[in-house]
A protein has these predicted regions:
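Short, flexible loop segments at boundaries between secondary-structure elements
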Residues: 145-153
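A short acidic, glycine-rich active-site loop
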Residues: 64-76
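Glycine-rich, Arg-bearing micro-motifs that act as flexible, cationic patches
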Residues: 116-141
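Short, hinge-like loop/turn segments at secondary-structure boundaries
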Residues: 63-66, 111-113, 135-136
């Protein structure tokens, strides 16, 4: 049995949903979940890609070229989700920002006053998880907004 809403309490509502994408299949799945929720709740969708500047240092090409390539990739990744959303009649805004992914996701979620943050989570080997953790885990543990974690199946 669901708990009753107490006098003076407002029911939870989602009018702004943030979906963070890295362009992966798991992010596409998370995007489909976010679109489904946004459509059903008449919520606005914000699609975010974070250019991981630390990754640009390890590409083996000039830093500026690497960042530009990651920005292009990010615009394509956000556009794919936006196109899916628009086909369903969901209002959508795209953002591509630079920084550490979990920090940027949390910052943008606060800036737009997101009611829900949706992120995908791909499997990591246990050694990687112990050493660095995943970006989605960092969002899950540090974000003050509700987070919906979509696991890769």
């Amino acid at each position: 049995m669901a708990p009753e809403i107490q006098e003076g309490q407002e029911p939870v509502g989602y009018s702004r949903i943030l979906i963070a994408t890295d362009g992966s299949e798991c992010s596409a799945l998370a995007g489909r979940h976010a679109i489904y929720l946004a459509e059903g709740l008449a919520a606005e969708l914000f699609v975010l890609y974070v250019v991981n500047v630390a990754r640009a240092f390890h590409t083996g090409i000039h830093y500026g070229e690497a960042v530009a390539e990651l920005e292009r990739f990010g615009k394509e990744a956000t556009a794919r989700i936006r196109e899916m959303a628009e086909k369903r009649g969901v209002r959508c805004e795209e953002r591509v920002v630079s920084g550490r992914p979990h920090d940027a996701i949390i910052t943008v979620s606060e800036e737009i006053e997101a009611d829900l943050v949706v992120v995908g989570s791909t499997g990591m080997r246990s050694v990687e998880r112990v050493l660095i953790g995943s970006e989605s885990e960092k969002v899950l543990y540090h974000c003050k907004r509700p987070v919906l974690l979509i696991r890769d199946t």
